[in-house]
Amino acid sequence: MMRALMLCLICSWLAGCAVNPATGRNDFVMMSERQELELGARYNQEILKQYPRYEDAKLQAYIQRVGERVARSSHRNQLNYVFTLVDSPDVNAFALPGGYIYIHRGLLAYLNSEAELAAVLGHEVGHVTARHSVRQQSQSTAWGLLGQAAAIGTGVGAVGDLANVMGNAFVRGYGRDMELEADGLGAQYLARGGYDPQAMIEVVKVLKAQEDFAREQAAKRGESPAAGGYHGLFDTHPDNDRRLQEVIGPARALAGGNQEVGRDRFLQMLDGLVFGDSAASGIRRGRHFYHGELDFTLTYPQGWQLVNRPDVLIGHTPDEQAFIAMTLEAVDKRLSPAEFLRQRVGNQRLVAGEELRLGVLQGYTAVLQGQSARRVAVIYRGDNAYLFVAAVKGRASLEAEDQRFLEVIRSYRPLKAAERKLAEPVRLHLVRVKAGQSMTGLASGAPLAADGEAQLRLLNGLYPRGEPRPGQWLKTLR
């Protein structure tokens, strides 16, 4: 029985071998190109629910043009590539199978030329042409099959779990290699498309500076730095990264004499770009949250951090041991706030319930009993129900944090007229540097945090100690 299963697995592996269109190597894949295209089209709709398109038709068209210019020089130029700027402050970009590529406006803000934009898009095109997501999916499937075969053959389910762990580790181990491969392919597409392939190195410098800044900020707060973001973690500076320089090298040989950078044209396209939170998702300012479209504000305890996503707002303690999440749902006006909560928790028991009176607004709050007790609440306003769920983990206890949870819930109120300005987003604006101007002076008038000068340098590729030149276009915030 075991031999037959292993034979089937080997046959599946042989059937799944295909020549990679970008590298010419035989890759193990268990998905046809047609299936790849169908998968990308299906998940594109899900992605756009989570990350809506940024509302700027001119900028969207520009990004599509730059992306198509790079993709035309790729190994899979027959695909219909779709490049989308998503309305998210995250520094990120990613690709789905089949040619759906997304760049977050948070990353776009830190780029400083059209060639750098082309480098980001070219890197993601490289992931598509090399079928990285397809290869990862196929590796995971194959290791899962191996685990099933071993479990059946030995009668020990733990063997299957071990194989899955090995498989996941194997796929994760591809991370650095795949990123470098995408860098090399993207640089080739840049050069063939008429852009300077050095822009790929410049983008990695931008990301390295982001990582260094985040590490410095975490150290000031006495925290550990977060895990690597877009493109992973960098052990060395890009100029000294031997493997990175090696994969970019062949692209330099393809470059002609007039490779395009397009700094000023690109910066003009960014003038007015929303930076940080958008009006549609609400604005975080210190420990306060303001939402102009929904007309409300919330206040959190001093030192808490806020995570703002399209579908949820989360406030949590610095050690992430206590958090409160708020989501928005439609009101069923046949139900009172108390009935709404009871319906939501089903057969779980609510205790210590009490009505909430927030001016003219009505709500209800209670503790949801169970192995991990939670504070829950709902506030009715118009056609919306604002649902709060608060919980603790680790050494924290609900009793110790509950008063602060209630203070957050009870801080909900409509905006005052003077606060409406606080619900408007910060935007990028271009200024031409005058003789004698410094980053210190330019940062003093910007709506930035305590390290605003460092933040402004990051935006302009001048971190950590660079200064602008007279006559240079510079990104500022207001």
Feature roles, as predicted:
Residues 5, 13, 17-300, 305, ...:
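A Zn2+-metalloprotease active-site environment signal
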Residues 325-327, 341-387, 391:
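Signature of long, low-cysteine stretches enriched in small and polar/charged residues
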Residues 316-328, 426-435, 476-478:
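Short, surface-exposed polybasic-and-hydrophobic patches located at secondary-structure transitions
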Residues 118, 254, 390-429:
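Surface-exposed amphipathic alpha-helical segments
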